Amino acid sequence: MLENPLIQQVLFEIMDEDVVGFDVLSVLINTNEVTDDEISRQLDVKLNNIRRILYKLYEARLVDYNREKDEETNWYTYTWKPSLEKVPALVAKKMKNVLNGLKEQLEMEETNMFFFCSDCEIKFTFEDAMDSGFRCPQCGGMMYEYDNKKDISLLKEQINYLEDEFTKNPLFSAY
């Protein structure tokens, strides 16, 4: 399941783009139940970093923990375990949001005329370009009509890819 690029992307975002998170998940999956301290030692990563990743995963409900108090030291030990059955639903929700955003962007691209400042590389709608007299508000340079056919084509490809993935991938069949 973790080999799926869509799942990897969503997990990467959940873990604040920290690739160590995948190592943490691997340890959790392979051991099924482990303390944060054991993960830290096994991966040779600072305990604070491991805990930060685990808390992010917990917020997404992708891991659970048990807390036990050591009666001698009065310290708590947290034992973590994976709870990855929620991953497909989480990814499906994220995919739907991305898909909706892409469809909105496609509609915007298809229903508007755009202008472009080649110096600043900023794209403007016709209305915004007209309001500024077809001069870039950043640099004052002249704006030129922008051909967005490639943008439209790319958006359609991305939408088709996500829709295909959503309908054909067995991970998402229930969603």
Curated annotation (Swiss-Prot):
PROSITE patterns: HTH_TFE_IIE. Residues 3-88 form the HTH TFE/IIEalpha-type domain. SMART domains: TFIIE. Keywords: DNA-binding, Transcription, Transcription regulation. It holds the Pfam family TFIIE_alpha. The keyword Transcription regulation applies. GO terms for biological process: regulation of DNA-templated transcription; transcription initiation at RNA polymerase II promoter. Belongs to the TFE family. The winged helix domain is involved in binding to DNA in the preinitiation complex. Transcription factor that plays a role in the activation of archaeal genes transcribed by RNA polymerase. Facilitates transcription initiation by enhancing TATA-box recognition by TATA-box-binding protein (Tbp), and transcription factor B (Tfb) and RNA polymerase recruitment. Not absolutely required for transcription in vitro, but particularly important in cases where Tbp or Tfb function is not optimal. It dynamically alters the nucleic acid-binding properties of RNA polymerases by stabilizing the initiation complex and destabilizing elongation complexes. Monomer. Interaction with RNA polymerase subunits RpoF and RpoE is necessary for Tfe stimulatory transcription activity. Able to interact with Tbp and RNA polymerase in the absence of DNA promoter. Interacts both with the preinitiation and elongation complexes. This is Transcription factor E. It comes from Methanococcus maripaludis (strain C5 / ATCC BAA-1333). The gene is tfe.
